[in-house]
Amino acid sequence: MDRQLFENTEERPRTLHQLCEVVNKPLLELQLGCVFCKKALTASEVYNFAYTDLRVVYRDGYPYGVCKFCLLFYSKVRKLRYYNCSVYGASLEALTKKKLSDLSIRCYRCQHPLTPEEKQLHCDYKKRFHKISHMWTGSCLTCWRHTTATESAV
């Protein structure tokens, strides 16, 4: 892991791109540990963490990300513990008084931000969005294929 200590909480980079600028390293040269299992993230996991636009977390002043296994595992735990409700796209727009395109919706499985096309697919295929831990979620195209009938019903 990059052993740069960030003691001042106000100056800590929140994204991997910001962290790269501060430590003056390209993205794929960053060495981060997983905040959950403490294993070193692979180059692929670092890239995926940046693509997913998740926030860097700090423990004792050091930056951490999350590995693929822990991300999927803790997303499942989060879904099981904090599921609130499920609604169709039109209902979600009425409930929030915002268009789907203006809502920040992540995949409940892998945490990728949903694209406008993925949000539209939910409407076209009459799939629901899920409120989990006070956030609206759905399925990205990659996870859509991996979801079973019981999982899609949340």
Swiss-Prot record:
Pfam families: E6 (PF00518). Belongs to the low risk human alphapapillomavirus family. The cancer-causing human papillomavirus E6 protein has a unique carboxy terminal PDZ domain containing substrate but low risk E6s do not possess this domain. Belongs to the papillomaviridae E6 protein family. It comes from Human papillomavirus type 53. One of its GO terms (cellular component) is host cell cytoplasm. Forms homodimers. Interacts with ubiquitin-protein ligase UBE3A/E6-AP; this interaction stimulates UBE3A ubiquitin activity. Interacts with host TP53 and EP300; this interaction inhibits TP53 activity. Keywords: Activator, DNA-binding, Early protein, Host cytoplasm, Host nucleus, Host-virus interaction, Inhibition of host innate immune response by virus, Metal-binding, Modulation of host cell apoptosis by virus, Transcription, Transcription regulation, Viral immunoevasion, Zinc, Zinc-finger. This is Protein E6. Signal peptide: none annotated. One of its GO terms (molecular function) is DNA binding. One of its GO terms (biological process) is DNA-templated transcription. It is found in: Host cytoplasm; Host nucleus. The lineage of its organism: Viruses, Monodnaviria, Shotokuvirae, Cossaviricota, Papovaviricetes. Its main location: host cell.
